[in-house]
Structure formats: C-alpha cells, structure tokens
UniProtKB/Swiss-Prot annotation:
GO cellular component: plasma membrane
Assembly mode: Homopentamer.
Descriptive protein name: Large-conductance mechanosensitive channel
GO MF annotation, one: mechanosensitive monoatomic ion channel activity
Length: 129
C-alpha cells in the first residue's frame, strides 16, 4: 500500500478534517479570549487598583546602553497572561462539560428480568427457606 493511499484513507476517516476545523476555531477563539482579557477584564481591574495598565508593569533589571534597550522584567504582561490562561481554562472546562452532557446517553431503565431469571430467583428464595 502506498504512503499516499494510506494517508488518503486516514484523512477520509473524518478525524483529520475534524481536527483541522478544531485548530482553526481554536485559533480564532484564542484571539477572542485574548482580547476579552486584555481589553475588557484587565482595564477595570487596573482601574480598581489605582489606574494601572498591566501591560506597562515592569521592573528595570539593567539600564539602557548605547545601541541596546533596557532589560525589563515585564511582570504585568505575565499577570495578564495568567488571567488569560484562567479564562481559557474555565471556557474549555465549560465546553467539555457541555459536550459530555450532550454525548452522554440517557440511562436506560433497568431491563425486565427474563423468564429464566425470574425462575432462578424463585428457586433461590425457596432454597433460603
């Protein structure tokens, strides 16, 4: 079997197409969540703690020299990315829970015992006496 034929069979199964769609949607979702955190969530938090823009929070480790910028420890961007991770984790957990609820089949009612099972139960009950 040729490599091309094997790949075609693998791709046609649907898993590759589903995965590609998931990656594309995930990339777009990541941009939306990033914008939500940086443009909607962080500004009010910064305002509440004194008008701070988290993107600008940094500590200068080494001053600027000729031809080189200052070395900065940008902890504000890190805090913002931690919030971003939290929002993505909550959204992914919510979507996973929703998908599992949709996929989970309704529990079937217990099946009625067969005639053989009923007979065996009666025999067991008689032997107990």
């Amino acid at each position: 079997m040729s490599i091309l034929k094997e790949f075609r069979e693998f791709a046609v199964k649907g898993n590759v197409v589903d995965m590609a769609v998931g990656v594309i949607i995930g990339g777009a979702f990541g941009k939306i969540v990033s914008s939500l955190v940086s443009d909607v969530v962080m500004p009010p938090i910064g305002w509440l703690i004194g008008g701070v823009d988290f993107k600008d929070l940094a500590i200068e480790i080494a001053p600027a020299k000729e031809g080189a910028e200052a070395v900065m420890l940008k902890y504000g961007a890190f805090i913002q990315n931690v919030f971003l991770l939290g929002v993505i984790a909550i959204a992914a957990d919510g979507m996973g829970t929703l998908i599992n609820k949709i996929k989970k089949p309704a529990e079937a009612a217990p099946a009625e015992p067969t005639a053989e099972e009923k007979l065996l139960t009666e025999i067991r009950d008689l032997l107990k006496k």
